[in-house]
Curated annotation (Swiss-Prot):
Molecular function (Gene Ontology), one example: ribosome binding
InterPro entries in the cross-refs: PRC-brl_dom (IPR027275), PRC_barrel-like_sf (IPR011033), RimM (IPR011961), RimM_N (IPR002676), RimM_N_sf (IPR036976), Transl_B-barrel_sf (IPR009000)
Assembly description: Binds ribosomal protein uS19.
Listed name of the protein: Ribosome maturation factor RimM
Length: 174
């Protein structure tokens, strides 16, 4: 079976002269994902096999996560990592509390209203602030934006990839 990967960040630049890299994070759990000793894989365009690295340090600076890796010790080595993607093996994801889900579990789910009519399929998740917003693609209609809040999202069944919502007035344009 082929290995499945999940994107957790992108190396956008170096920071300092000791091999530290600047990362735009794509994970909801940077403190877990980038903790010292965590194993990540660096995917560089045009490079066959990913480079396995171990996090040596992590700190936040402005809107970036700054990382060093045990295997990278100089600015010159870090320069080569620019524009690379950081990934983790899907099988090494941490467990979540009840009612919490990874984005990849939600994207692709079919959404049904209270009459069990198909609304559409979740194609993207936006994170604008207080709560996530699910972008639901609908056949022949504009995408619907569904807030992930208890008064709207009533039931999530990851095993069957279905989600049931209560459509509040004005939530979905016809």
């Amino acid at each position: 079976m082929e290995q499945e990967w999940l994107n957790v960040g992108k190396i956008v630049n170096t920071h300092g002269v000791r091999g530290e890299v600047r990362v735009v994070s794509k994970t909801d759990f940077p403190e877990e994902r980038y903790k010292k000793g965590s194993v990540l894989y660096i995917f560089k365009q045009g490079q066959g096999e990913p480079l396995k690295v171990t996090v040596a340090s992590h700190r936040q600076h402005k809107q970036f996560d700054l990382l060093t890796f045990e295997e990278i010790s100089s600015l010159n080595e870090a320069e080569l990592l620019k524009e690379s993607i950081l990934k983790v093996e899907k099988e090494h994801l941490g467990s979540l509390d009840e009612g919490e889900f990874y984005f990849h579990q939600i994207i692709g789910c079919e959404v049904y209203d209270e009459e069990n009519q198909l609304v559409g399929q979740i194609k993207e998740i936006l994170t604008p602030g207080a709560n996530d917003v699910w972008v639901v693609g609908r056949k022949g209609k504009k995408d619907a934006l569904i807030p992930y809040i208890p008064s709207v999202v009533k039931k999530i069944d990851i095993s069957s990839k279905t989600i049931h919502i209560e459509v509040m007035e004005g939530l979905i344009d016809e």
